[in-house]
Amino acid sequence: MNSASACCWWRLALPIADELEESLIWKLTELGISRIAVQHVPEKAERTLLAWLPSSEWSESDRDQLMVNLRPLAEPFGLQLANPTWCEVADEDWSLNWKQHWQSDPVGQRLLILPAWLDLPQEYADRLVVRMDPGSAFGTGSHPSTRLCLEALEKNPPLGLRVADLGCGSGVLGFAALGFGARQVLAADTDSQAVCASRANAELNQLDLDRFRVVHGSVDALSAQLQGEVVDLLLCNILAPVIEALASSFDQLLSANGRCLLSGLLVDQAPRLQVVLEALGWRVNSLTVQGCWGLLDVSKR
């Protein structure tokens, strides 16, 4: 490419519905693309996914193939991806300016997700602030499934409860739970990078290591951390098939009056998951919906 020395990157700008954000970020990361940002206006349903690709490594045919790989991710939602916009940009466009695409994000009536480098906007001064570094691309609260959990925590605060967060990602649910009154959060994720991101974000929020603990693994890792004790509330914002596969082991983590907030499921997956949970002895208290996504509030019978 003749302009490679002057223009070091291809920048992809792709308008997306909010339902697609985490799936597309996951796919880009899986393909080895780590320079990612999401530009959006808080509480709006559409945003722009941005990605920077080395121009010397991504020919036109490679970029076309990338879109071929991304388009199927929209199909389960009954959506189609918009046409991408590609432009060549200099190196400093990524290294210096990517943070400008992230903004403070109010959630519910009381919570504010604030990128770590931004000052607290005066209009949100009375909100509970959770500071996050979104550079890890593990979710910062903008996805509907995450917002459903955050809003459920606000609606029914876990005052004095011990909470477990299975599939914690960036740690945002656990931080919010502590802000809403939980006495301790034990978190786990099978992705070691997510564990590192959670620990880094815990430091940003100046959390005591005993109040927020995160380990690599799944249910067994949480159980080992508990050392025979139990939690009062389990947060689980992961895909419905994974919830279904793990549901039989939730009982070992929870107290007799324990509850689970199960998100990450599409609304049309909820009926099957409800049947599975009821067969395992759980009572489904409610289904909350946001767009195509649902959250099940379940408890022991």
Swiss-Prot record:
SUPFAM superfamilies: S-adenosyl-L-methionine-dependent methyltransferases (SSF53335)
Catalyzed reactions: L-lysyl-[protein] + 3 S-adenosyl-L-methionine = N(6),N(6),N(6)-trimethyl-L-lysyl-[protein] + 3 S-adenosyl-L-homocysteine + 3 H(+)
Subcellular location: Cytoplasm
Gene3D superfamilies in the cross-refs: Vaccinia Virus protein VP39 (3.40.50.150)
Domain of life the protein comes from: Bacteria
E.C. number: 2.1.1.-
Keywords: Cytoplasm, Methyltransferase, S-adenosyl-L-methionine, Transferase
Chief location of this protein within or outside the cell: cytoplasm
Binding locations of S-adenosyl-L-methionine: 146, 167, 189, 237
GO biological processes: methylation
A GO-annotated cellular component: cytoplasm
HAMAP family documented for this protein: Methyltr_PrmA (MF_00735)
UniProt record similarity statement: Belongs to the methyltransferase superfamily. PrmA family.
Function: Methylates ribosomal protein L11.
Name this protein carries in UniProt: Ribosomal protein L11 methyltransferase
Organism of origin: Prochlorococcus marinus (strain MIT 9303)
